[in-house]
């Protein structure tokens, strides 16, 4: 990833509009900022949330609070706790949380 054309700036996430996204179970609440081609989101999941699809887009994800269970399409599962991150490239292992 190469980031260009993004001047220095601060993001006050408490002022970014929150949108709701329903999963197979539970809800995800996204706060999204777009910087050129780069999308940055702060996401809150309700307990028991599970995405309604497998994702093949690349992500860098950092768990700030609670636990997040991540499932790969090949059956592997991972539990993230505060301070743990994952990173995956576009079109690599399909995943869902």
Please provide the spans of the model-predicted regions.
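Conserved short histidine dyad/triad with adjacent acidic residue
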Residues: 36-56, 89-91
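Short acidic-glycine-tyrosine-enriched beta hairpin
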Residues: 74-91
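Short, conserved beta-strand element in jelly-roll/cupin
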Residues: 45, 54-70
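A short, N-terminal "cap"/entry segment at the start of jelly-roll beta-barrel domains
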Residues: 1-41
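Short, Lys/Arg-rich amphipathic alpha-helical interaction segments
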Residues: 96-97
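A short, sequence-level motif marking secondary-structure junctions
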Residues: 14-16, 46-48, 82-87
């Amino acid at each position: 990833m190469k980031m260009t054309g993004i001047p220095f700036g601060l993001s006050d996430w408490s002022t970014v509009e929150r949108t709701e996204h329903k999963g197979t179970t539970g809800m995800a609440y996204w706060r999204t900022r777009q910087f050129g081609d780069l999308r940055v989101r702060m996401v809150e999941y309700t307990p028991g949330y599970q995405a309604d699809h497998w994702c093949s887009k690349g992500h860098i994800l950092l768990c700030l609070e609670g636990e997040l269970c991540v499932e790969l399409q090949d059956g592997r599962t991972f539990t993230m706790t505060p301070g743990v991150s994952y990173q995956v490239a576009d079109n690599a292992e399909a995943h869902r949380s």
